[in-house]
């Protein structure tokens, strides 16, 4: 996710890290959405979001050796069985959307109208959605005020690569 520095007030960051740029909060969220990184209750709704579907194991956010946390048995069993059908993924729209035009939890559909997942959050032309992995290479869309809005999903580069057989 980049660098986070604590420096003395007035420090010249381009001297500390040559070629670096200082971003604002919108830059941070765009970068986060491009990488498929969830943050907070909008991306991880309490009582709804599951740790493995939210890629927390990929980010070392789950311990499979520590016990005694709520959902630990289900999480460990699912991880070791290897069947995770949905994951949070970065999505991109063909054009930037008006701010707050997509309701949280809006259903994402395949071209044939079958449910592919749910939109979690986004801004401009980027977002994050919980999608069925079987549908990520298909054309996807959202219905917004009666209009079909097309979007594409992608697998982030930082995800572990599947083992070759």
Residue spans of the language-model regions?
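Residue-level signal for inorganic ion chemistry
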Residues: 5, 71, 113
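Short, low-order "capping/linker" segments at domain edges
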Residues: 35-48, 159-165
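Glycine-rich, small/acidic residue-mixed loop/short-helix segments
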Residues: 54-60, 76-165
């Amino acid at each position: 996710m980049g660098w986070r520095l604590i420096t003395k007030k007035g420090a010249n960051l381009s001297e500390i890290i040559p070629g670096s740029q200082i971003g604002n909060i919108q830059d941070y969220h765009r970068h986060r959405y491009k990488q498929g990184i969830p943050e907070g209750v909008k991306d991880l709704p309490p009582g709804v979001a599951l740790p493995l579907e939210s890629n927390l194991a990929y980010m070392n956010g789950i311990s499979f050796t520590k016990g005694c946390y709520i959902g630990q048995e289900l999480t460990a069993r699912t991880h070791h069985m290897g069947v995770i059908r949905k994951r949070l993924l970065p999505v991109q729209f063909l054009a930037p959307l008006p701010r707050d035009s997509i309701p949280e939890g809006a259903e994402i559909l395949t071209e044939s109208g079958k449910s592919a997942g749910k939109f979690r959050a986004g801004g401009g032309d980027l977002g994050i959605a919980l999608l069925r992995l079987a549908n990520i290479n298909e054309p996807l869309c959202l219905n917004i005020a009666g209009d079909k809005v097309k979007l594409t999903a992608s697998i982030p580069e930082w995800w572990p690569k599947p083992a070759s057989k």
